[in-house]
Design a protein with these regions (language model features):
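Short, non-transmembrane alpha-helical segments in secretory-pathway proteins
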Residues: 1-30
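Exposed beta-strand-loop-beta-strand "reactive/processing" segments of non-cytosolic proteins
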Residues: 19-63
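C-terminal partner/receptor-binding element of secreted or periplasmic proteins
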Residues: 69-97
């Protein structure tokens, strides 16, 4: 996944940890999730260290096409990338705005 947020998060994790942790994209459920009639892969971006993997965000990536949604676990729904960027401002986690 080539989202600029994930690239920036990965760089920040490596820099902040002195190379001891890395960003990783992992599948958290092998079963596709159906959203709006579309089958989606269920992936999470995690901070992966020697001791643990800490989830930063979960994504739903359409099996066909290029749609990417972000899971809002609190509201139990998915939001578009535009909604996610507007409401969660993910680049603020890196100091980039």
């Amino acid at each position: 996944m080539a989202l600029p947020e994930l690239k920036a998060w990965s760089r920040q994790i490596v820099n902040a940890s002195g190379g001891q942790a890395h960003g990783a994209l992992i599948e958290y459920d092998a079963r596709p999730k159906i959203i709006g009639g579309k089958r989606c892969f269920q992936l999470s971006f995690v901070e992966n260290s020697r001791d643990a993997a800490q989830r930063w965000e979960s994504f739903l990536v359409a099996e066909s096409g290029n749609e990417i949604l972000v899971e809002d676990h609190a509201a139990d729904q998915a939001m578009t990338l535009a909604q996610w960027r507007a409401t969660r401002q993910p680049m603020q986690r890196t100091g980039v705005r």
